[in-house]
Amino acid sequence: MMKQIQVDLGERSYPIYIGQNLMNDSEALSRYLFKKRILIVTNETVAPLYLNQIQEVMVSFGEVESVILPDGEQFKDLTHLDAIFTALLQRNYGRDSVLVALGGGVIGDMTGFAAACYQRGIDFIQIPTTLLSQVDSSVGGKTAVNHPLGKNMIGAFYQPQLVLIDTQCLHTLPAREFAAGMAEVIKYGIMWDGEFFQWLENNVQALKRLETEALVYAISRCCEIKADVVSQDETEQGVRALLNLGHTFGHAIEAEMGYGNWLHGEAVAAGTVLAAQTARSLGLIDESIVCRIVQLLQAFDLPVSAPESMDFDSFIQHMRRDKKVLGGQIRLVLPTGIGQADVFSQVTESTLEQVICCA
């Protein structure tokens, strides 16, 4: 059974298809690929698992080629972005071509950014293969590469034509990667939907066993929330900022520790706890809410504290470069309950120092 969710952006609206074995569903793909030149962008981990399978489906639509990049956040940079451009140019791809992102968040972000830039914009499709990319990065049109001084600092908003989520991919996903994806799933419950958070608390084992019904529901609910938020605020001028819960602290951890040493979801998990502790210190939530957040993250074997090697100065240096900074003020997304959050710009550095040093 396939579930469909629509991201409503007027002429740039697109569907999200969610279900089992969708990569074999030529009907789902045909509308977007028929008589097109197709370049699949994937990585060295995903290619042996799924590249031949998806090529066999797509070859009936048009000419299909691929470019295989190294796997890892540390390769999400301008050098490897250029490898996509080189493949497009060497093979004379035109504006009627389609890029297909087959992989996790790194591949999706880089492929989308390449699509946004190449000949001032060509179509692309997201086929996310990790839980994190299925519930978050593949939806909403954020595309980017990293810079040594900051994560996702070079990018664009550019929407895909289609997001195709095949839950079967999660059965080849390492346990650590699955857990990292759950950090983003849990985030949606904290910042938007308290009933979903409670459902997650009650379905930990079903999700860890990769039960199809539980996976489809969790992924669908996350995509519904993301689609709703993006439809209201595509370029993050308002409510979309709430999706960054845990990310200001989390991006600081990733940048300080070196991209790839902590998975993005692991950094978001620790960052979410720091955000909750900051909210508690400001009197926005009580200790019981912090405990529920910590316990749910721990149930999926996620880190709930920052690396011991990071001190306040390390955090603040990176947080001052965060994309949400306005007028020199660090802006934090903080929970104000289970199922609700807000953006705060008046959190003092002394408060942050107390939270970070006592965490």
From Swiss-Prot:
What compartments host this protein? Cytoplasm
A GO biological-process term: chorismate biosynthetic process
Q: In which pathway does it act?
A: Metabolic intermediate biosynthesis; chorismate biosynthesis; chorismate from D-erythrose 4-phosphate and phosphoenolpyruvate: step 2/7
Which top-level enzyme class is recorded in the Swiss-Prot or TrEMBL entry? lyase
Q: Which cofactor does it need?
A: Co(2+); Zn(2+); NAD(+)
Give the co-factor note: Binds 1 divalent metal cation per subunit. Can use either Co(2+) or Zn(2+).
Q: Name one GO molecular function term.
A: metal ion binding
- UniProt: Zn(2+) binding residues: 184, 247, 264
What Enzyme Commission number(s) does the record list for this chain?
Answer: 4.2.3.4
Q: Kindly list the positions annotated as binding NAD(+).
A: 71-76, 105-109, 129-130, 142, 151, 169-172
**Superkingdom of source:** Bacteria
Keywords carried by this UniProt record: Amino-acid biosynthesis, Aromatic amino acid biosynthesis, Cobalt, Cytoplasm, Lyase, Metal-binding, NAD, Nucleotide-binding, Zinc
The record lists the catalysed reaction(s) as: 7-phospho-2-dehydro-3-deoxy-D-arabino-heptonate = 3-dehydroquinate + phosphate
What are the record's GO terms for cellular component? Answer: cytoplasm
Q: What does this protein do?
A: Catalyzes the conversion of 3-deoxy-D-arabino-heptulosonate 7-phosphate (DAHP) to dehydroquinate (DHQ).
Family indicated by similarity: Belongs to the sugar phosphate cyclases superfamily. Dehydroquinate synthase family.
The record ties this protein, via HAMAP family, to: DHQ_synthase
Specify the protein name.
3-dehydroquinate synthase
According to its UniProt entry, this protein's organism is: Shewanella putrefaciens (strain CN-32 / ATCC BAA-453)
